[in-house]
Design a protein with these regions (language model features):
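N-terminal accessory targeting/assembly segments
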Residues: 1-95
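The conserved Walker
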Residues: 154
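Conserved glycine(s) of the Walker
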Residues: 157-158
């Protein structure tokens, strides 16, 4: 199970307190069910849960300073070092959590070479599902390894099943 601190350490203090309160209070949805934190300039933050329920944090509007703070924390104050990841739209942080970023694309010769004016951040919470590959591992590994392509829409568990396959190997 991933630690909540791996995510909350990336957030501005005012947002961090609310996220911790929402997901750690007994009887609430809980961190184990938190799937995403959606953060967009001039909008309230949204907590998404695995059961497709959402909690809109109405009392906080995200500012450009909040976005800048999160980017600094995600890139450890070295945005240049993460430029390739940012260009691809996300950065993976400790615990396997993915931080999706969206802003204005910077292009050179018709190719995206970076982003500026980042206005949206989506934090995808990594979840370990031990045993989810149990039904397919024999097929993949019997008689030697087979080439396998895992395809599904976003958020349906591709990375989760790949991690479990690796755990078996």
């Amino acid at each position: 199970m991933s630690d909540l601190k791996e995510i909350t350490c990336l957030l501005p203090e005012r947002l961090k307190r609310i996220v911790e309160t929402e997901v750690m209070v007994p009887g609430k949805n809980g961190f184990c069910k938190l799937s995403e934190i959606r953060i967009r300039i001039n909008r309230p933050a949204i907590l998404m849960y695995n059961n497709n329920k959402e909690k809109v944090i109405e009392n906080i509007k995200i500012t450009s300073d909040d976005i800048a703070y999160i980017i600094q924390m995600v890139t450890r104050y070295s945005m240049y070092a993460y430029q390739d990841s940012i260009r691809q739209g996300y950065v993976t942080v400790k615990g396997g959590h993915r931080i999706g970023v969206a802003g204005q694309a910077i292009t050179r010769d018709g190719h995206i070479c970076g982003q500026k004016y980042i206005s949206y951040i989506n934090i995808r919470v990594a979840h370990e599902v031990v045993g989810c590959a149990d039904e397919i591992i024999d097929f993949i590994c019997s008689g030697g390894f087979k080439n396998t392509l895992v395809v599904s829409p976003p958020g349906c568990g591709k990375t989760t099943i790949l991690r479990d396959i690796i755990r078996h190997i």
